[in-house]
């Protein structure tokens, strides 16, 4: 039986630990938690250093000084959590807001990040990243919609692209202060020179932070407009800002310098938005009850996945016979190593609604990861069909078919996994499974093509080129698979030609 990949999460959620969207600083006494966006200045400056300049050394000194002030803590990797039900909820709750922002729903994604802080951000493109801690802190779906509306404001107004407009003036101030400071030091006025440099750094930082706060206020206003246009109440947006305000009180709002924040303080944001949101025709419109129900389910299963089993069982004791209780405990028992108890919780869910595909999914994956792939096939097939071949669920179904080690299941696995990769070609696990079943079926050429797809997606262009060339030599010419192999081989070779040092043999 093929081993379970270490990166594949338990029941429903799948973690991808290699994702590092941006350095992140956890809130502390001088940094209130709020919606964050954009790559931090340190990352933007690092990109600039790649371009030679006659004054490079001086710029490096200035940029390092400013970046050291702006970057509170070092970056760390953040993993994406993928779950079919959660992604479906995100898509449905964001579509009216995306349209209100003048964007295409097909181009905008909302992605869940495994991070317990209350945070959301954009980092280029049209993807909104939401931390798991934000979902846990939110009390309803309407609050999450308020967060998404704000982040869409950043996307629609091009704030990531415009970040240089705030960085450059700050850099120039810092650079000038360094020049004057070094000149003073050279003239023998060491203390005066150091003071000039320190003042310049503070001025540069203040310039950037002022620019950032202006963008945040603009995103708040845009988010409020999108909610109104979409006919969605802004009560959730205001109430979530009040949640953030409570965090500020916890840190001691009197100790927070409003001029040293990337975002306006939550009290200011509430004051600026309240009148407009309350004047909206949608203010007293109830939030969609079906969406709120889906949110409660997702929140319960998320707690079961990210929290310790003890914490989950405290919040959802076995006396809780609700759907949310069964959902959360299914994850908790599975994580704790009690497969029979986890299966019992999943069977209780199916008993409550046999036609719910996500209940079938969780049972199938519990059985699969408990080493019972043959038993997992029926519920996973039902889940795949019930979600019209959702790519994530279909990938798990294909995994189960392969894991039975029954050759009679391989043709169906190939069919299922080809559909899954066709709908979501950015899932490395799906490509891995497709390559595995092709190899087991004796089709080494298409196994190589699947390997090339996976390697290309992960930036391993040498492996991609080698695998694609093998596929080209063994797949009938001018077929769709042959053409795809040709595309990958050419793209990979171009990357290697453009970056010879990167691929130089050691």
Language model regions located:
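Catalytic Zn2+-binding segment of zinc metalloproteases
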Residues: 152-169, 187
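Alpha-helical linker/edge segments of TPR/alpha-solenoid repeat scaffolds
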Residues: 270, 373-374, 406-410, 440-449, ...
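Extracytoplasmic and endomembrane cell-envelope/extracellular-matrix remodeling and assembly machinery
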Residues: 82-84, 88, 110, 207, ...
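Helix-start (N-cap) detector for alpha-helical repeat units in TPR-like alpha-solenoids
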Residues: 323, 357-358, 391-392, 428-429, ...
């Amino acid at each position: 039986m093929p081993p379970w990949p270490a990166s594949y999460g338990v029941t429903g959620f799948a973690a991808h630990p290699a994702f590092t969207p941006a350095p992140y600083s956890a809130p502390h006494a001088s940094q209130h938690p709020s919606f964050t966006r954009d790559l931090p200045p340190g990352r933007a400056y690092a990109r600039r250093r790649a371009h030679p300049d006659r004054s490079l050394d001086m710029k490096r000194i200035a940029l390092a000084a400013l970046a050291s002030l702006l970057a509170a803590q070092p970056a760390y990797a953040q993993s994406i959590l993928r779950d079919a039900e959660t992604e479906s909820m995100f898509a449905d709750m964001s579509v009216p807001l995306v349209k209100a922002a003048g964007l295409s729903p097909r181009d905008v994604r909302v992605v869940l990040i495994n991070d317990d802080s209350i945070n959301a951000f954009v980092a280029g493109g049209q993807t909104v990243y939401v931390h798991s801690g934000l979902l846990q802190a939110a009390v309803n779906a309407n609050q999450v919609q308020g967060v998404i509306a704000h982040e869409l404001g950043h996307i629609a107004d091009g704030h990531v692209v415009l970040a240089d407009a705030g960085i450059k003036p700050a850099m120039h101030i810092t650079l000038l202060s360094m020049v004057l400071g070094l000149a003073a030091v050279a003239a023998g006025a060491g203390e005066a020179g150091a003071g000039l440099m320190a003042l310049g750094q503070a001025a540069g930082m203040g310039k950037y932070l002022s620019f950032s706060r202006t963008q945040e206020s603009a995103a708040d206003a845009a988010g409020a407009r999108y909610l109104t246009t979409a006919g969605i109440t802004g009560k959730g947006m205001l109430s979530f800002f009040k949640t953030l305000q409570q965090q500020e009180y916890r840190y001691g709002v009197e100790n927070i310098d409003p001029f040293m924040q990337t975002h306006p303080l939550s009290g200011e944001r509430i004051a600026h938005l309240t009148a407009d949101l309350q004047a909206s025709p949608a203010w007293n419109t109830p939030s969609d009850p079906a969406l709120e129900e889906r949110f409660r389910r997702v929140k319960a299963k998320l707690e079961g996945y990210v929290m310790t089993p003890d914490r989950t069982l405290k919040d959802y004791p076995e006396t809780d016979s609700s759907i949310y209780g069964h959902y959360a405990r299914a994850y908790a028992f599975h994580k704790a190593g009690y497969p029979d108890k986890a299966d019992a919780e999943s069977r209780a869910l199916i008993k409550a609604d046999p036609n719910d595909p996500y209940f079938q999914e969780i049972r199938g994956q519990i059985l699969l990861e408990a080493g019972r792939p043959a038993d997992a096939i029926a519920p996973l097939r039902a889940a795949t069909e019930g979600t019209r071949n959702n790519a994530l669920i279909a990938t798990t179904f294909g995994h189960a078919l392969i894991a039975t080690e029954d050759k009679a299941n391989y043709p169906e696995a190939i069919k299922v996994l080809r559909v899954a990769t066709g709908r979501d070609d950015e899932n490395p696990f799906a490509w891995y499974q497709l390559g595995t079943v092709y190899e087991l079926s004796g089709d080494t050429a298409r196994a190589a093509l699947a390997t090339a797809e996976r390697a290309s997606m992960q930036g391993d262009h040498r492996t991609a080129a080698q695998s694609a060339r093998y596929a080209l030599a063994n797949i009938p010419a001018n077929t769709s698979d042959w053409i795809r192999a040709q595309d990958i081989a050419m793209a990979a070779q171009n990357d290697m030609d453009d970056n010879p040092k990167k691929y130089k043999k050691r």
